[in-house]
């Protein structure tokens, strides 16, 4: 769950 939010912030598409 946390990794999903982190990946979104890392790659804002």
Swiss-Prot record:
It comes from Rhyparobia maderae. This is Brain peptide 37F3. Brain.
């Amino acid at each position: 769950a946390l990794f999903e939010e982190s990946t979104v912030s890392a790659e804002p598409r």
